[in-house]
Structure formats: structure tokens, C-alpha cells
């Protein structure tokens, strides 16, 4: 199945000049969603994760059901102030300004094998920050996984871990 056929392209979103690859149409098609999750499971399984870390917010949509399918745990990497209790965070640079990812203290034990999951790999900034945060708490980051990669942006080069993707947009 060609998953690109189920991903809607929206020009000029979220700002002029950007072509947004919207996975909501893929999620809405039961067959395409099943195929996507099966393919992701096959790609992630080989990294033998103990736990999957989903990046806010579309990463949650993938990581939670994928963790169930693989029989491993799931944790959330969220933006500043969204998690209850004590958190550990990491600030990272954006094109204009900074952002922050946080994880609940104790959510991952030092040495646990983690695969970080998001919907899309573009410049690699968010995934790289998530990987750095996971390393900061002592996790063994085995890989990253996404549905979409915008390979022309070379984000994979920033990750320093294997990256599993299903659909590549080269321009």
C-alpha cells in the first residue's frame, strides 16, 4: 500500500511557503492506519525497546498504540508545564526563539532501551532535543521512528541514532 496516497498535502500551512503533510486523513482510513502501525511495529521491533517515548502531540497518536502492539511501555515528552508532578526538562532552539520538552521524573529508568516516536522528521530539532532529554535521564536511546521524513532537510543527520521512517518526501 502506498501510504502517500493517504497523506493530505496542505499548502501554506502553518505559514506561507510551507507544504504541510497531514496524517489525519491516513488515521481516518482504517486499512491505511492498520498498515502504517504494522510497518512501524516491524521497523521498531528490531531495536528491542523497553519503552516508547511519544513527542507531543502527534507522536502520542503513534507511540501509544505501537507500544501496545509491541508489548512495551509508553511515556510522553511534553511541552513546558503540561505534565503533573516533578519533571525534568531540556530547552532547545527553534527558528525563532526556544522551546522546552519535559518528561516526568522517574518515567524511564536509567538504562532502559527507548525508541522516540513522532509523526514527522523535518529539520530534526524536536527529535534531537527529545533524544538529548532521554540521554540526560540515563535512557539508552535505541532509535527514532516517524511516519514521514522530509529527507531534503537532512534532519536525520542531527539525531545520532538510527531513524526508521515509512514515507519520504525528497523535495
From Swiss-Prot:
Its EC number is 2.4.2.7. One of its GO terms (biological process) is purine ribonucleoside salvage. It catalyses: AMP + diphosphate = 5-phospho-alpha-D-ribose 1-diphosphate + adenine. One of its GO terms (molecular function) is adenine binding. The keyword Transferase applies. Pathway: Purine metabolism; AMP biosynthesis via salvage pathway; AMP from adenine: step 1/1. Keywords: Cytoplasm, Glycosyltransferase, Purine salvage, Transferase. It comes from the Bacteria. Catalyzes a salvage reaction resulting in the formation of AMP, that is energically less costly than de novo synthesis. Belongs to the purine/pyrimidine phosphoribosyltransferase family. PANTHER family: ADENINE PHOSPHORIBOSYLTRANSFERASE. This is Adenine phosphoribosyltransferase. It comes from Granulibacter bethesdensis (strain ATCC BAA-1260 / CGDNIH1).
Amino acid at each position: 500500500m502506498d501510504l502517500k496516497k493517504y497523506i493530505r498535502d496542505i499548502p501554506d500551512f502553518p505559514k506561507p511557503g510551507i507544504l504541510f503533510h497531514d496524517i489525519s486523513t491516513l488515521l481516518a482510513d482504517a486499512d491505511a492506519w492498520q498498515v502504517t502501525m504494522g510497518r512501524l511495529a516491524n521497523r521498531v521491533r528490531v531495536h528491542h525497546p523497553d519503552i516508547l517515548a511519544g513527542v507531543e502531540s502527534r507522536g502520542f497518536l503513534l507511540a501509544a498504540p505501537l507500544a501496545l502492539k509491541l508489548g512495551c511501555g509508553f511515556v510522553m515528552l511534553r511541552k513546558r508545564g503540561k505534565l503533573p508532578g516533578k519533571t525534568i526538562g531540556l530547552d532547545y532552539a527553534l527558528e525563532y526563539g526556544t522551546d522546552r520538552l519535559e518528561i516526568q521524573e522517574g518515567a524511564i529508568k536509567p538504562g532502559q532501551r527507548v525508541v522516540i516516536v513522532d509523526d514527522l522528521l523535518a529539520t530534526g530539532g524536536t527529535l534531537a532535543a527529545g533524544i538529548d532529554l532521554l540521554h540526560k535521564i540515563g535512557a539508552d536511546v535505541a532509535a527514532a521512528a516517524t511516519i514521514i521524513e522530509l529527507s531534503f532537510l537532512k534532519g536525520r543527520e542531527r539525531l545520532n541514532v538510527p531513524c526508521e521512517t515509512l514515507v519520504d518526501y525528497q523535495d
